[in-house]
Amino acid sequence: MPVTAHRAHPARVGSDRGERGLGEFEAAGLTIHTHSADIASKEDCDALVQTLTENYGGVDILINNAGRSIRRGIENSFDRFHDFERTMELNYFGALRLTMGLLPGMISKQRGHVINISSIGVLTSAPRFSAYVASKAAMEAWTRCAASEFADRRIDFTTINMPLVKTPMISPTKLYEQVPTLTPDEAANLVVDAIIHKQVRIATRLGIFGALVHSLMPKVAQIIMNTSFRMFPDSAAAAHKDGEPHQPPSADQIAFAQIMRGMYF
């Protein structure tokens, strides 16, 4: 990830898992401030907003990156409504709380940029990820409304429809060890591009193609996505079959995943 030492004081919110990456920023001459918060907690969000406002006068750029993903078909989710509640609480309400809390500071400074890390799954309507995709789609819908309201206030909004990235979030799904994914550096470069150019949306060609097919040929899109749904089954845990041995991906699965690089299966 390229780092340039402008007069910036990044404030990072998260757990200790990313501490090893801070050295790169510090070596570039940036002053890093870290804060720990549970974004799904209203109290933590409110406290974080207060801290950022009092200590730094708010923020110029907010990147909503925290997220929870659940890979489970709807038929295996009938008794797991809490999956939908948990994804909404973090991916939508948590991001919304932070954004709403920090927007007044951007308004007073007459500048700001909100970058929301969404998913390619919103563009492709990825099956087996209904809880995750719905929560990301909710944030996208709110972002479009907000962008229209603040278009004349020098506050920009960017949505990044991130493809599948090789991070600890996908590690429970062993299938992803065999399919092509973005590296964390490649994902970070998309965020850097958003900061520099302030696009309304950043998406891969596959994501844009998926959205076009869903808009212009919805039945064809459903057939394609149903094919992927049947080709890549739920994990044993998601299907309530704990203890069954993990099955390595077939040649057909690997070939399909290579063609659809970055897609959620």
Describe each PLM feature range.
Residues S69-E85, R128:
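Conserved mid-core segment of classical short-chain dehydrogenase/reductases
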Residues S36-A47, F81:
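The beta1-alpha1 cofactor-binding region of Rossmann-like NAD(H)/NADP(H)-dependent oxidoreductases
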Residues A28-T31, T51-L62, I70:
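A glycine-rich helix->loop->beta "capping" turn
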Residues T99, S135:
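Active-site helix of classical SDR
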Residues T159, Y176-S215, M231:
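C-terminal helical subdomain
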Residues T124, C145-D156:
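Active-site-adjacent segment of SDR/Rossmann-fold oxidoreductases
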Residues S119:
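Residue(s) in the substrate-gating loop at a strand-loop-helix junction
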